[in-house]
Amino acid sequence: MEDKKKIIFSGIKPSGDLTLGNYLGAIKNWTKLQEEYDCYFCVVDLHAITVKQLPADLRRRTLEVLAIYIASGINPEENTLFIQSHVPAHSEASWLLTCNSYMGELSRMTQYKDKSKKMGDSIGAGLFNYPVLMAADILLYNADLVPVGKDQMQHLELARDIGTRFNNSYSKTFTIPEGYVPKEGAKIMDLQDPSKKMSKSDANPNGFILIMDEPNVIRKKISRAVTDSIGIVNYTDEQPGVKNLINILCAIKGYTPDEVVKMYDGKGYAEFKNDVAEAIVEELAPVQEKVKALLGDKKALEEIYKKGAEKANYAAMKTLRKMQKKIGLIPR
């Protein structure tokens, strides 16, 4: 009998248009996981509304993120692709877990602390409870592994703590997940300020490349990317702008940083930047084409997310019913 595949859960918020960082740092890696694991890839729209969204934009981006998953090579026949709000168990489980969470542990979350410093008392309760919803997302599917970046590791630790606490209080209910850090997978930094991660919420549009950016826009943004006055392509922390561009090229082409440094020995930044830009354009062109085709066939896309929600709902409801029974709620 063949071993049961381990379960992976991951998702992206449709709170902004997706960037090259989302693609190279997450989605491209997910495509490599689908053979080996039973994958649940979600568009986490309920997380997006912790900050007010324009309804039409949220709907557009939710479908676009789903289309990007598929266009990047994630097979909807082999994986469970769905929209978070289409599986009501996420919201229900989140409340049950909220009642097993502590104010202290939630207020210690770095992202919440950073945002509350800026926003004070006007910070939304949704941002405070965000990590509990994330815990529900993961625990509902009994995920073994969760691909996470460093910025989400603290939230995953909390999910583990909440899951363990529930198991200890009510008997074994959840698999306690591990963080999955892929061997490959670059952390792509801001093109204008390489000390921070490339982010779709950046105020300066030259700092990020969107997956759906036109080729000429990509070329322009890379040509304006911050480098330095050294003029030599080196992979070193002293040249963070150049290092970031090397990481982008390596993530796309499969080179090692040393190989890139050798390739551009004696060559200037102009040629190097030009090659990085062309590599990005070449990588994203087929993805963009497929995304446009998928968004042009809303019926086919709807079929995919409805089928995905059905499959996700089946798994999530099994866990939710266990939770309800153990807590003492009367089955409906």
From Swiss-Prot:
It catalyses: tRNA(Trp) + L-tryptophan + ATP = L-tryptophyl-tRNA(Trp) + AMP + diphosphate + H(+). It holds the Pfam family tRNA-synt_1b. The keyword Nucleus does not apply. GO terms for cellular component: cytosol. A motif ('HIGH' region) lies at residues 14-22. Keywords: Aminoacyl-tRNA synthetase, ATP-binding, Cytoplasm, Ligase, Nucleotide-binding, Protein biosynthesis. CDD domains: TrpRS_core. Its main location: cytoplasm. It is found in: Cytoplasm. It comes from the Bacteria. L-tryptophan binds at D137. Transmembrane segments: none annotated. It is an enzyme of class 6 (ligase). Gene3D superfamilies: HUPs, Tyrosyl-Transfer RNA Synthetase. Its EC number is 6.1.1.2. Homodimer. Belongs to the class-I aminoacyl-tRNA synthetase family. Catalyzes the attachment of tryptophan to tRNA(Trp). NCBIfam families: trpS. This is Tryptophan--tRNA ligase. It comes from Clostridium perfringens (strain 13 / Type A).
